[in-house]
Amino acid sequence: MNDVMLQPMGERTPMTQSLRDRAQDAIMCCAALAWRIGGNVLFGMTTALALQQVPLPEACDLDAEMLHITSSTPDRRRRRIPGTHPHVWKLIATHPDACVPIKGNVFALHPFHAWAQLSSHVSLEELVILAEAIITAISKSSGRYPRLVLSSLREFIDNA
């Protein structure tokens, strides 16, 4: 397997531990790629979720083991690197909070942006389930009440 691809999550590991382990694995893979590229790298889609300990959608037409690199415009898109898939997300330019620093040169799209990115790759049911997972993850990591996180998600949707 390519050294920059994520490993599949173990099926018998408790979810919180497996999310933590998957995030650490993702950070290592993403940091190695950023070092190889020699600069900051923004990750989106399922990679952004993995980096931030958000459960991945069960039914998604993207390969969750690939590293999904995101840029703001097509001309800024990274060249194709084995084990990666480049994407463009134009909202980066207009939403200053779209990029979340993870470690060193590794950045991830905010979970709301990753959710919106994934909207064309999952069913409506999966999108609702993913929104709930994101609300829970943000609530747990920030200490904010889930209703406040939901309100922030609604505001994001209204302003996107």
Placement of each model-derived feature along the sequence:
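Short gly/ser-rich loop at a beta-strand->alpha-helix junction or flexible surface loop bordering the NTP-binding
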Residues: M1-A160
